[in-house]
């Protein structure tokens, strides 16, 4: 099925690309989320008329994401207190929701889906490097310090 992308889609293309995808992927994911429209003659003409508007909107979203990434970097680090044993191992773990809540409490709104933990959840005390994907092209790094609760 031919579709016109209205947004950048990972491993597929960027705004304005006409790509061939499976019908189910287009019908169940791309079209309902507003990331693509079927490539009919009417839609192609409509898209070409609105291309500049859509590109400007995409640039605004990217600029907002870069501003959020800059705010995250300005924080420097976030401290999370958790119960821990004598050897520095946590009772439980610190996951994406805990990190997102701590960063939001520090003043930058982050959804738990934007937190990237390449080594899995945090299970030890100390400093951990955590990355945030605030946009498909924009990443931010932050130190998360896990301390023992008193």
Curated annotation (Swiss-Prot):
The lineage of its organism: Bacteria, Pseudomonadati, Pseudomonadota, Gammaproteobacteria, Enterobacterales. Pfam families: Ribosomal_L9_C, Ribosomal_L9_N. It comes from Pectobacterium carotovorum subsp. carotovorum (strain PC1). NCBIfam families: L9. GO terms for biological process: translation. Keywords: Ribonucleoprotein, Ribosomal protein, RNA-binding, rRNA-binding. Coiled coil: none annotated. One of its GO terms (cellular component) is ribonucleoprotein complex. This is Large ribosomal subunit protein bL9. One of its GO terms (molecular function) is rRNA binding. It comes from the Bacteria. The keyword Cell wall biogenesis/degradation does not apply.
